[in-house]
Amino acid sequence: MIKQRTLKNIIRATGVGLHSGEKVYLTLKPAPVNTGIVFCRADLDPVVQIPARAENVGDTTLSTTLVNGDVKVDTVEHLLSAMAGLGIDNAYVELSASEVPIMDGSAGPFVFLIQSAGLEEQDAPKKFIRILREVTVEEGGKRATFVPFEGFKVSFEIDFDHPVFRDRTQSASVDFSSTSFVKEVSRARTFGFMSDIEYLRKHNLALGGSVENAIVVDKDGVLNEDGLRYEDEFVKHKILDAIGDLYLLGNSLIGEFRGFKSGHALNNRLLRALIEQTDAWEVVTFEDASTAPISYMRPVAAV
């Protein structure tokens, strides 16, 4: 049986919020079966919990924000991408502020944290959402689609009219039966244009952004001294973002996601459209792991 997974141990980290610039304390904790991923604002009394579900998404302007009433948690997508990539079904994410720390702008540090905490299988079957037919949403020349696929695949195309992007791959398709999320996707960093960052800072956004946690592009090229981690790091980061956004379904996917210039808003619209169209998907479990179209790394012991 493919079983649900949680963390073996509690683990903590400190970072800054990308948009707030605030110092944030992050604690990842194990959770019981069928809990899902739950964000907890530990700085509030009483603590406010926000389950990582598509219906709890509020603002999607620059990141994916979860809301519960007037309480929010910003920038959840990179941590959720790491949770999805490592097959974590159940965990509590405690935060001391309203934003998940940006770390280095990728999911890599979160992968390291989760692997350091160790993974533990739980005595309950892991639930997958299997796509049964195509579902598409479009808006302003952007498109996001689910199609049936025996496995998990993410295809993405970006289209930036800028020399840095024109000279590099702007499309990628990753089939996770043959490609490692950890090696090929998790280290892709978020990116931004110098001109946009100056505008955002005037509006009290991207206050924590720097070349330490983002790829910064100006009219001449990439400003980061070390350059890119992957030749196709820009589109790979869009795939990373999409994996995090898709995990707001609450379960791992069996199917393919195709994005064309899609962002957090359209990704969430696609999830909501899928949820409403109940004939387009089903929940499945696997008694025999060898028959499943998706496999996960064996649980690792805590470091």
From Swiss-Prot:
The signal peptide, as residue positions, is none
Q: Which Pfam families match?
A: LpxC
Any coiled-coil ranges, and where? Answer: none
> Per the UniProt entry, what is one GO biological process?
lipid A biosynthetic process
Q: Where does Zn(2+) bind?
A: H78, H237, D241
Which cofactors?
Answer: Zn(2+)
Q: Which domain of life is it from?
A: Bacteria
What InterPro entries does the record point to?
Ribosomal_Su5_D2-typ_SF (IPR020568), UDP-acyl_GlcNac_deAcase (IPR004463), UDP-acyl_GlcNac_deAcase_C (IPR011334), UDP-acyl_N-AcGlcN_deAcase_N (IPR015870)
Pathway involvement?
Glycolipid biosynthesis; lipid IV(A) biosynthesis; lipid IV(A) from (3R)-3-hydroxytetradecanoyl-[acyl-carrier-protein] and UDP-N-acetyl-alpha-D-glucosamine: step 2/6
Q: Quickly give the catalysed reaction.
A: a UDP-3-O-[(3R)-3-hydroxyacyl]-N-acetyl-alpha-D-glucosamine + H2O = a UDP-3-O-[(3R)-3-hydroxyacyl]-alpha-D-glucosamine + acetate
- State the EC number(s): 3.5.1.108
Keyword Cell inner membrane attached = no
Cellular component per GO, a single term? membrane
What sort of enzyme, by top EC class, is this? hydrolase
Which GO MF terms are attached to this record? metal ion binding; UDP-3-O-acyl-N-acetylglucosamine deacetylase activity
Q: Which residues form the active site?
A: H264
Write out the entry's keywords from A to Z: Hydrolase, Lipid A biosynthesis, Lipid biosynthesis, Lipid metabolism, Metal-binding, Zinc
The record's similarity note reads: Belongs to the LpxC family.
Family matches, as NCBIfam families: lpxC
Q: Function of this protein?
A: Catalyzes the hydrolysis of UDP-3-O-myristoyl-N-acetylglucosamine to form UDP-3-O-myristoylglucosamine and acetate, the committed step in lipid A biosynthesis.
Q: What is this protein called?
A: UDP-3-O-acyl-N-acetylglucosamine deacetylase
- Organism, scientific name: Pseudomonas syringae pv. tomato (strain ATCC BAA-871 / DC3000)
The gene name on file is lpxC
